[in-house]
Amino acid sequence: MSNQQPTNIGSMAAITPSVKFLLILNVSIFLIEGVLRIPLSRLFALPAVWWETWSFGSLFTYMFVHANGTHLMVNMLGLVFIGPAVEQTIGSYRFFVLYYLSGVLGGLGWSLLAQEGAF
């Protein structure tokens, strides 16, 4: 058994396929919104009472919009530092399913606790 720590943790060399795809998707949506001034957050955001407006699809899209650059950066840093290890352990398909399930369950939990009218 080796006591050496991996040297590529958090480096771009350690980025796995699903993590890379999610990074590109999240950053692209943020840039489209900011540079082209297309209000994707209005389309993708999760209203607190999504069931009243039949915004079921928002449960699957809200996780790709971010309030500001800091919000995006912190989320993507978490994805870069934790995602590859999880993806390598459970595989790309299961990682993607876990990412989506976590997002959907997080959205459901948030909508139960959020005040009406919140995004």
PLM region descriptions:
Residues 14-119:
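N-terminal TM1-TM2 helical hairpin plus the immediately adjacent luminal interfacial "cap"
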